[in-house]
Amino acid sequence: MSFTCADCGTKACEQRNYDKMPDDSVCISKNTDQQWFKDLYDEEDLKIAHNAAVTEAAGYCRQTRLEETMAFAYRMGYRKLGIGFCTGLSKEASVLARVLRDNGFEVEAACCKCGSIPKEFVGITREEQLHPERDFEIMCNPAGQAEYLTSRGCELCIILGLCVGHDTLFIRHYKVPVTVLSGKDRVMAHNPIGALYQADSYLSRVHTFIKDTFG
């Protein structure tokens, strides 16, 4: 097993304490030239990073993620926001749109079922449908969501409750900055990291999930 940042508990990089950092062979902060990291940031990246840091400090432990999302968008000068959401969270999307508009933002939104394309298009058989008794089911269309919101001139898009994999496609196709308000987790009330808090107790099954599920 290779040693990674996830296995390191020193957080020495936060203090720039090289003495407490792990060996050069495994520590990113030690074995990678700092200039290489800096060169990754173009002018727009620097603006995003700056305003993200300002937003973090200004609302630290006081503002919700929703409030921080609006603060970040405002500081960036974004005024037209897109919402890419799952139809299972239609009510939440409606509230989000209303809150954003109440704060002066223009809002566009696209639900996951936009286009009304049957799942047959991506090779799903009737037996593989969520409801096999139905003649057809409509697929989620994250590529369509992303391209539509991009075409509408959205400056920042907010992902709200897209399924695993569908969020991957959305991010892959979206042409401008994107942030996540919430992931999809039907079991954990859309709080996916709740499973991490229970991984060593009530949800210990996650440690052997692949073996138990796929053999």
Features from the language model and the residues they span:
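Electropositive, gly/pro-rich neighborhoods at or near active sites that engage anionic ligands
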Residues: 1-80, 87-92
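Gly/Ser/Thr-rich loops at beta-strand to alpha-helix junctions
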Residues: 59-63, 85-93, 115-116, 160-168
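Short glycine-rich or small-residue beta-strand-to-loop segments that form or flank ligand, phosphate
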Residues: 78-87, 109-113, 156-160
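Long, charge-dense
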Residues: 91-142
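Short Gly/Thr/Asp-enriched flexible loops that form oxyanion-binding sites at enzyme active sites
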Residues: 92-99, 167-176
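Short, acidic/small-residue loops that bind anionic groups at enzyme active sites
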Residues: 106-113, 169, 173-191
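Active-site glycine-rich loop that binds ribose-phosphate moieties when present
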Residues: 137-151, 162-164
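C-terminal functional extensions of proteins
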Residues: 179-215
